[in-house]
Amino acid sequence: MSYQLARQFLFRLPAEASHNISLKMLKMADNAGMLGMFMPQMYSRPVELMGITFPNAVGLAAGLDKNGDYIDGLSKLGFGFIEVGTVTPKPQDGNPPPRLFRLEERSAIINRMGFNNYGVDYMTERLRKKKYGGVIGVNVGKNKDTPAEEAASDYIACINKVYPYASYITINISSPNTPGLRALQFGDSLRSMLQEIKDCQERMNQQHGRYVPFVVKIAPDMSDDEVHMVARTLLDYNMDGAIATNTTLSREGVESLAHGKEQGGLSGAPLTKRSTHVVKELCVALEGRIPVIASGGVMSAQDAVDKVRAGAKLVQVYSGLIYRGPVLVREAAEAIGGLDG
């Protein structure tokens, strides 16, 4: 059955139910050995970045597999890397449903999930048991009830657990669905937290004899000056990379649609242009000294190419996968692989 046929069925269901059923179907197909029969071989054009060899430049963004339950099935879809999470130290339910909405007319999604996950101990066990041996990123966050001034302790608690299993770790300070989280992107709050996180990275490196890169995921809802300010701080603290961007609070172009005014972060096609602009500004500000991974509104191969031309070294997809299916992964990887240089 083609993805487009499956989508017709899945899109008749509420968005969160569709999400959960899709992942369970993927796991069943993988366990039955069926995915290899239907999925094309992964496109290979290796990218060397942060001391890691990525088989291709297209990865899965965090948010689809929050607990690491579906890594092995997702690995069959052609991704050059997979990012799981966001995971927090303690399990939490997230916000009450309904909390996930499709805006099909604009190929968009609004979510206010609120870091629902089973906690870092569960995630660590899933990472330990996975068969997938490729590049795995782990996206870490803070619990909702942890005060912002104590956020670093939550990130460090997660890092301490997942470090042995992660290829890289993403510090998520940009979700719009955890109160006060985005304030950590600026000023003394960011500097203080990054210092503690870098100290933790050094301890983990010494303890495990293995350096795991740390990247910071930023929001799209910043002025150019704010993007440059964040970039300077990332450089000051020798962060290994950045992901641009998370979801947006803007509702430009979707206000009149059903669910268009729901609270939460907007992703998909309406985010494409803004996210690419932030990627470009961030790359300029970072002066090529640390790499940028582009995420946000990658709905086509051309979108992926535009992100790379804006300066990104890798791209991630999520909403595009929901609307286009696995074909997007190969199309985007081939398009990036075909670029000169």
Swiss-Prot record:
Catalytic machinery residues: S175
Gene Ontology biological-process annotations: 'de novo' pyrimidine nucleobase biosynthetic process; 'de novo' UMP biosynthetic process
Cysteines engaged in disulfide bonds, as pairs: none
Cofactor(s) needed: FMN
Cofactor binding: number and manner: Binds 1 FMN per subunit.
Residues that bind FMN: A62, G63, L64, D65, K66, T86, N139, N172, K217, T245, G268, G297, Y318, S319
Keyword Oxidoreductase attached: yes
Cellular component GO terms, alphabetical: cytoplasm; plasma membrane
Superkingdom per UniProt: Bacteria
Keyword flag Glycosyltransferase: no
Compartments it resides in: Cell membrane
E.C. number(s) listed in UniProt: 1.3.5.2
Entry's Gene Ontology molecular function annotations: dihydroorotate dehydrogenase (quinone) activity
Binding site for substrate: K66, N111, R112, M113, G114, F115, N172, N177, N246, T247
Family per similarity comment: Belongs to the dihydroorotate dehydrogenase family. Type 2 subfamily.
NCBIfam families for this protein: PRK05286.1-1, PRK05286.1-2, PRK05286.1-4, PRK05286.2-5, pyrD_sub2
Protein's name according to its UniProt entry: Dihydroorotate dehydrogenase (quinone)
Name of the encoding gene: pyrD
